[in-house]
Regions:
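Conserved phosphate-binding elements of NTP-dependent enzyme cores
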Residues: 1-326
């Protein structure tokens, strides 16, 4: 594939593997062009043989594409907590008295949404010869819902107020609700506490979308390592490219914690990464090179970070050594 040169790659199951190397050396070709293709129905086969694939249940490419295809999608809908929030509002005495069920609190439902903005909280303005733009809906004041729906309040807050909360605020507000609090706390721990839970997905950065996807995987449920080893169940393979882009040091530390949690749950994680802090946390490193283009596509060194750091030919080794020394 591209510039890969008949290499043999070993990726330990249930561990964190980081693929390193200079730009253009074959990192993406290895991950997207080979590893991801192994699990496709009609793969573009670029390998001679592969083993161990049956130990993997699903392969997920956790990229930086948007978390939703419409302006209505948001963190709360993507991580599935909005369903729980709607049920909570529907159980309130006033809601039951008025015959409101959980669907009433969906901003996609005509009976509950603001008739002016159709549940968006914003109005799309079509501009001649200019890109379309969005403006605040004055009818609902950006709350998305009609007055009757907004009149139902949980601890003094309407469903519109809840969607306007930041993840930090919502985690505290729903502290008594285990499932909601756990998911919101995970989002908070990955450095996303400043986002509104109802923030439209098109306004999120690629890095924010990627971390939301990682948290979603963490909420799917824990897999017993004993079950995996005894072949009673299979774990997933997660392929993640450059997740540290645009992150501050503290957020990188939070990202590392998320990657370790996936591994602790029995999954296999493969990351293409340039950040030495993440390299140093790997169980296994595959260092590609030695150069880019036709002079790349080979494995320069493979193994634990300490082994790769001592390589005489690796362009990554000096930087990794410095990171390991702290």
């Amino acid at each position: 594939m591209n510039n890969l040169k008949k290499i043999e790659v070993r990726i330990p199951l249930g561990r964190l593997t980081v693929i390193t190397g200079i730009s253009g050396c074959g990192k993406s070709s290895l991950m997207r062009g080979t590893l991801a293709e192994l699990f496709k129905r009609n793969p573009d086969k670029t390998w001679a043989s592969a083993s161990g694939i049956k130990s993997i249940r699903h392969c997920y490419e956790v990229d930086q594409s948007p978390i939703g295809k419409t302006s209505r999608s948001c963190p709360a809908t993507y991580v599935k907590i909005f369903d729980e929030i709607r049920k909570l509002f529907a159980q309130l005495p006033e809601a039951r008295m008025k015959g409101f069920d959980a669907s009433r609190f969906s901003f996609n439902n005509a009976s509950g949404q603001c008739p002016e903005c159709k549940g968006n909280g914003r109005i799309k303005l079509e501009m001649d010869f200019l890109p379309s733009t969005w403006t605040h809906c004055e009818s609902c004041n950006g709350k998305r819902y009609n007055p009757a729906t907004l009149a139902i309040r949980y601890n003094g807050q309407s469903i519109g107020d809840v969607l306007a909360m930041t993840i930090d605020e919502a985690a505290e507000f729903f502290a008594a609700h285990g499932k909601l609090h756990r998911t919101l706390s995970l989002l908070k721990e990955t450095g996303l506490g400043y986002l509104q839970i109802g923030q439209p997905s098109p306004t999120l950065s690629g890095g924010e979308a990627q971390r939301i996807k990682l948290v979603t995987e963490l909420t799917r449920g824990r897999i017993s390592k004993t079950s995996i080893k005894s072949r009673k169940t299979q774990a997933n393979l997660y392929l993640i490219e450059e997740p540290s882009i645009g992150l501050h040091l503290e957020d990188v530390k939070r990202l590392i914690d998320v990657l370790h949690r996936l591994v602790e749950e029995g999954h296999t994680v493969v990351v293409v990464e340039h950040h030495t802090g993440i390299m140093a946390e790997a169980d296994n490193i595959i260092d590609m090179g030695p150069e880019a283009g036709e002079s790349g596509g080979r494995i320069v060194s493979q193994g634990p970070p300490e082994k790769v750091a001592n390589s005489k030919t690796s362009r990554t080794a000096p930087f990794l050594r410095a990171a390991l020394k702290g």
